[in-house]
Amino acid sequence: MKCPVCHQGEMVSGIKDIPYTFRGRKTVLKGIHGLYCVHCEESIMNKEESDAFMAQVKAFRASVNAETVAPEFIVKVRKKLSLTQKEASEIFGGGVNAFSRYEKGNAQPHPSTIKLLRVLDKHPELLNEIR
């Protein structure tokens, strides 16, 4: 079968590891079955192959999303804890202007900071334990 994209190469059944990037994070999706063009490397997958591919994509995206947080959430938790941006930066680290950058969406906190913010959102009384 000729490639439907480049019309030059033949489509050959194979298994490949596919590089994948989401929100600046990179991974390699392992063992992706499909038909691959020997010329342009385009791929065609049947439903089963596509479902397996998408399962890996969704799992990676979920792991990346678990490490990121919306700026609005950071503002909400900081205010819930009655902290200024400066106080929050002193407690959680990241530099003197860290929370300003996080709340504007210009930077993401370290994953450990995100986890701690999530815990404090549910249990604000624990703030005194980390001060």
Swiss-Prot record:
Gene Ontology cellular component list: toxin-antitoxin complex
Domain HTH cro/C1-type stretches: 74-127
Gene3D superfamilies in the record: 3.10.20.860, lambda repressor-like DNA-binding domains
Post-translational modification: Degraded in the presence of oxidative stress, maybe by the Lon and/or ClpX proteases.
Effect ascribed to mutating N97A: 50-fold reduction in DNA-binding
Claim: Transcription is one of the keywords in the record: yes
Temperature dependence as stated in the record: The MqsR-MqsA complex is exceptionally thermostable with a Tm of 83.4 degress Celsius versus 48.1 degress Celsius for MqsR and 61.1 degress Celsius for MqsA.
Gene Ontology molecular-function annotations: metal ion binding; protein homodimerization activity; sequence-specific DNA binding
Residues binding Zn(2+): C3, C6, C37, C40
Residues within the DNA-binding region(s): 85-104
Subunit annotation: Homodimer. Crystallizes as a heterotetramer with MqsA, MqsR-MqsA(2)-MqsR. Purifies as a probable heterohexamer of 2 MqsR dimers and 1 MqsA dimer. Binds promoter DNA as a dimer. When the 2 dissociate the MsqR mRNA interferase becomes active.
Role summary: Antitoxin component of a type II toxin-antitoxin (TA) system. Labile antitoxin that binds to the MqsR mRNA interferase toxin and neutralizes its endoribonuclease activity. Overexpression prevents MqsR-mediated cessation of cell growth and inhibition of cell proliferation. Initially reported to act as a cotranscription factor with MqsA. Following further experiments, the MqsR-MqsA complex does not bind DNA and all reported data are actually due to a small fraction of free MqsA alone binding DNA.
Domain notes: The Zn-binding N-terminal domain (residues 1-65) binds to the MqsR mRNA interferase toxin and makes contact with the DNA phosphate backbone, while the C-terminus (residues 70-131) binds the promoter in a sequence-specific manner. They are linked by a short flexible domain.
Name of protein: Antitoxin MqsA
Taxonomic classification: Bacteria, Pseudomonadati, Pseudomonadota, Gammaproteobacteria, Enterobacterales
